[in-house]
Amino acid sequence: MADKITSRSEDYSQWYIDLVRSAKLADYADVRGCMDIRPNGYAIWEKMQAALDRMFKETGHVNAYFPLFIPESFIAKEAEHIEGFAPECAVVTHGGGEELAEKLYIRPTSETIIWSSYKKWIQSYRDLPILINQWANVVRWEMRTRLFLRTTEFLWQEGHTAHANPEESQEEVLRMINVYKTFAEEYMAMPVIMGKKTDNEKFAGAVDTWCIEAMMQDSKALQAGTSHNLGQNFAKAFDCQFQTKDGVLDYVWATSWGVSTRLIGALIMAHSDDRGLVLPPKLATRQVVIIPILRGDKAAVIERANALAQELNKNGIPSFVDSSEQNSPGWKFAEYELQGIPIRIELGPRDIEKGICIAARRDTLEKTELALDETLPDQISEILNTIQESMFERALQFRTEHTFEVQSYEEFKVAVEKGFVIAHWDGTAETEAKIKAETKATIRVLPEEADYIAQYRIDEPGTCIYSGKPAARKVVFAKAY
């Protein structure tokens, strides 16, 4: 019930944990740093998977699966990659009661094991491109964990593609980060800023990393997806060459891209409230709950409620009836608000007499009287569409209100406690590191969206807020998850 949930204003971190557990999305497992994803949480992941998988296939990708275990020699082949991931790796040293001749790493990501296979599959330009996605689990040995946001084991998808030239691989990088942006905004109702990471923040072994960054309700940033241009780094590490159309040997060009169950954490923190989960309809497995008010002729009310659910389901609106009598209507209202069901329909004997029902929106709690006739499915569809759009607009307005442009480091230190800060940066890793050490804020993204660049004059040259040196452009700073 919602009374178990700490308010956001009292303790945002505790609110998040309380909500995740009370809404039965996930819980702490008996294995250090791991979580149990409960059916309510996994249902959201399945909706995300279905939408993303469709989008991947529409862009020409196919699914495959590669081993969980990666030989130590594979990991060591890409020096920058292993340096970035070594502290997070879990290692298997024994199997079958004996010490292994070579240690096996449990995948923190799959570039190395996949490129060992690509080397066998690619001989000619005719074998390219390879456009493969994998749905899998990965392990990264996290010291400080938080349900969905940072756990030792988590679920994700990782795309790995191989190309004949750098132009194709860069097109792929941009195509997939745009897929993620579309998914975040159209399905999650979560506005994101798309752009590049700094060299300090990019993926280990990548030439460039593109990302989407979202703002949570505590004004912190959350990286919601990444797409990496790997250049020829992994192809060279695994000696993956192909014969070009001109008959010469060249190394393959590569990309990788991924999102994880972290998106569920982002969804919660972007939209939910002190009553519980608020879900965008496109990611809600159950969009409508019908609660009969059981007075008078109970059987007739339940029969009408079931008929209504049947009609909505027939029209593609996933609906169900809670006609149980062990809990009061008020208890049910609170319970389904906690679970984030987008629309609640209240139906009593007087409503049936009048030919109406009451529909309550989860996002605003606003109630509307609707006619109990053949137009009801269309009315409900319209409300669901309005909820989806309104959630995005509210999140966008919140981000706008918590985005600040500053001209000095003193202004920066105040503003970064309140949200995103747009400021000039001199482009050096030294300045980036000093700002992070002093404020815990990082450069989240070098924006590359035309609208965002125009809105905040990102390309306008100026003076670095920290060093006073010339700066070619502005960047987005924030504290982050």
Curated annotation (Swiss-Prot):
Gene3D superfamilies from the UniProt entry: Anticodon-binding domain, Bira Bifunctional Protein, Domain 2, C-terminal domain of ProRS
Disulphide bridges: none
Predominant cellular place of this UniProt entry's protein: cytoplasm
Keyword Nucleus: no
Reactions catalysed: tRNA(Pro) + L-proline + ATP = L-prolyl-tRNA(Pro) + AMP + diphosphate
Pfam families: HGTP_anticodon (PF03129), ProRS-C_1 (PF09180), tRNA-synt_2b (PF00587)
SMART domains on file: ProRS-C_1
CC terms in the record's Gene Ontology section: aminoacyl-tRNA synthetase multienzyme complex; cytoplasm
Localization, UniProt: Cytoplasm
GO molecular function: ATP binding; proline-tRNA ligase activity
CDD domains: ProRS_anticodon_zinc, ProRS_core_arch_euk
InterPro entries according to UniProt: aa-tRNA-synt_IIb, aa-tRNA-synth_II, aa-tRNA-synth_II/BPL/LPL, Anticodon-bd, Anticodon-bd_dom_sf, Pro-tRNA-ligase_IIa, Pro-tRNA-ligase_IIa_arc-type, Pro-tRNA_ligase_II_C
Similarity comment: Belongs to the class-II aminoacyl-tRNA synthetase family. ProS type 3 subfamily.
HAMAP family noted in UniProt: Pro_tRNA_synth_type3 (MF_01571)
UniProt function note: Catalyzes the attachment of proline to tRNA(Pro) in a two-step reaction: proline is first activated by ATP to form Pro-AMP and then transferred to the acceptor end of tRNA(Pro).
This protein's name: Proline--tRNA ligase
Organism field: Pelodictyon phaeoclathratiforme (strain DSM 5477 / BU-1)
